[in-house]
């Protein structure tokens, strides 16, 4: 049975509907447990508007299935200066935000903020440039673990705990999927093809 509908961002044309059944939330267990690394004793924050599928797969379904508490941060316009004190004030342990927000965060003097409760920082939604990865790590001691998902399903590729984060890498396929990168004819590409 149909549970909910999202619309894609329309990257390749008009937005397209993605319909999901009641099995949909179960696919996000891997997102929360093995990419975000949420903990039943922790507090998770994903920054995503509820109009996006990422709100469901980044801060609700998998996280609740893993018994994690969710921190909700609402804003009319994102301001890193307003967000940064909340990590220490509320003891946020896991965090996910789009690369654009990390770019805004590193423009602040991050040494003024306490990230000691944060165990994992993740990102998805667009490419994370290597300079942001390096600056965030240098200023906070935290590496950013990238992932890739779509409106149509859960996380497909991610830097899971058993993978060392590397600037510019989205990680490896989720254990749920066999993933091939194919050329314009649908044929699998060899390793190293860009």
Region annotations inferred by a language model:
Residues 65, 92-97, 106-166, 178, ...:
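Gly/Ser/Thr-rich phosphate-binding loop
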Residues 6, 178-179:
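Generic short beta-strand
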Residues 168-174:
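Short Gly/Pro-enriched turn/cap motifs at secondary-structure boundaries
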Residues 180-194:
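Conserved beta-loop-beta connector loops within the AMP-binding
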């Amino acid at each position: 049975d149909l549970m909910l509908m999202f619309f894609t961002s329309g990257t390749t044309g008009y937005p397209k509907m993605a319909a999901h059944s009641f099995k949909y939330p179960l696919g996000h267990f891997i997102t929360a447990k093995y990419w975000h690394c949420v903990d039943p004793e922790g507090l998770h924050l994903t920054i995503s508007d509820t109009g996006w599928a990422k709100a469901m797969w980044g801060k609700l379904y998998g996280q609740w299935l893993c018994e994690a508490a969710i921190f909700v941060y609402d804003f009319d316009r994102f301001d890193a200066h307003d967000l940064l004190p909340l990590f220490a004030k509320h003891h946020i342990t896991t965090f996910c935000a789009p690369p654009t927000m990390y770019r805004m965060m590193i423009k602040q003097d991050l040494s003024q903020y306490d990230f000691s409760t944060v165990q994992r920082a993740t990102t998805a939604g667009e490419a994370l440039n290597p300079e942001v990865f390096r600056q965030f790590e240098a200023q906070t001691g935290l590496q950013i673990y990238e992932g890739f998902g779509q409106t149509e399903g859960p996380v497909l590729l991610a830097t899971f705990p058993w993978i060392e984060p590397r600037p510019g890498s989205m990680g490896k396929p989720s254990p749920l999927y066999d993933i091939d990168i194919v050329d314009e004819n649908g044929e699998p590409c060899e390793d190293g093809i860009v």
